[in-house]
């Protein structure tokens, strides 16, 4: 089988295209396929905070596959064993949370690459990613088409950002606003002026280093700010949040507003 692996999301980052995404936290292939028909450039399947098993991730990758939206998987953490499983089920773009140091970044890079470039375990004959051994020269193609994104979301990570940006094999850095604002002493307040200043500066530093800069903004105004600051892959919503907002909005048409939650939501 002479199929060539491609990664349109990674190619878009290389070209500097702006790519708009959506967070998937509902854990179902049905919802993933609905989102995939909506036209988002990328869909983040969340395995960190949503209760997704590896098999759940697998089914959502299958559901998204026929459509143009590109899947990005965020595993619960960046261990070598878990990364191996997620790549074998067909993920080509990973977002690794809580990367605080350059050494952590190097370990993640190694876990995602086959030897001699890294330490990814070899098992193409049983992997969906290799079409069960039917893709010729799969290991070399996999190394080339992989897109690796890491999350900077703590004071420690901010201090080490320049070193993280120097790590070969990192394609982009994603700023985690919820954890970052909490780490900076502003829990549940990513809109605080000091947090905003730091986010803007980080985006500039990431792009200046030649890497892609990413962000999740459930507030459209914040999303527009990040795009203006130079972020080039931005998630503009979370499926579960959009669902609850729509449910509350519809109920408010028929019941008094006091009986419906009107609190402003943040991720």
UniProtKB/Swiss-Prot annotation:
Catalytic activity: 2-dehydro-3-deoxy-L-rhamnonate = (S)-lactaldehyde + pyruvate
Enzyme Commission number(s) from the entry: 4.1.2.53
Cofactor(s) the protein requires to work: Mg(2+)
Site (Transition state stabilizer): 74
Taxonomy, superkingdom: Bacteria
Active site as annotated: 49
Cellular component terms (Gene Ontology): cytoplasm
Top-level enzyme category: lyase
Keyword set includes Metal-binding: yes
Segments crossing the lipid bilayer: none
InterPro entries linked: Aldolase/citrate-lyase_domain (IPR005000), HpcH-HpaI_aldolase (IPR050251), KDR_aldolase (IPR023593), Pyrv/PenolPyrv_kinase-like_dom (IPR015813), Pyrv_kinase-like_dom_sf (IPR040442)
Pfam family, one: HpcH_HpaI
Subunit structure: Homohexamer.
Family statement drawn from the similarity comment of this UniProt entry: Belongs to the HpcH/HpaI aldolase family. KDR aldolase subfamily.
Name this protein carries in UniProt: 2-keto-3-deoxy-L-rhamnonate aldolase
Organism encoding this protein: Salmonella dublin (strain CT_02021853)
């Amino acid at each position: 089988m002479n199929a060539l692996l491609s990664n349109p999301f990674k190619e878009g980052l290389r070209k500097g295209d702006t790519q708009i995404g959506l967070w998937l936290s509902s854990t179902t292939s049905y919802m993933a396929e609905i989102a995939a028909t909506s036209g988002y450039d990328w869909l983040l399947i969340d395995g960190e905070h949503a209760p997704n098993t590896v098999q759940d991730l697998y089914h959502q990758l299958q559901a998204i596959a026929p459509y143009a939206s590109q899947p990005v998987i965020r595993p619960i953490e960046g261990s070598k064993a878990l990364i191996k499983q997620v790549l074998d089920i067909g993920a080509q773009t990973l977002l690794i949370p809580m990367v605080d140091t350059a050494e952590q970044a190097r370990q993640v890079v190694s876990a995602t690459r086959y030897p001699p470039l890294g330490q990814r375990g070899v098992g193409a004959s049983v992997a969906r990613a290799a079409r069960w051994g039917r893709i010729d020269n799969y290991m070399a193609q996999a190394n080339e088409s992989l897109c690796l994104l890491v999350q900077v979301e703590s004071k420690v990570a901010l201090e080490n950002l320049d070193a993280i940006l120097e790590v070969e094999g990192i394609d982009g850095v994603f700023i985690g606003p919820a954890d970052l604002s909490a780490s900076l002493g502003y829990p549940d307040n990513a809109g605080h002026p000091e947090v905003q200043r730091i986010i803007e500066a980080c985006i500039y530093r990431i792009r200046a280093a030649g890497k892609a800069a990413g962000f999740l903004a459930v507030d459209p105004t914040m999303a527009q700010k990040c795009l203006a600051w130079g972020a080039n892959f931005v998630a503009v919503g979370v499926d579960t949040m959009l669902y609850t907002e729509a449910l509350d909005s519809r109920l408010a048409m028929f019941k008094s507003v006091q009986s419906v939650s009107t609190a402003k939501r943040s991720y």
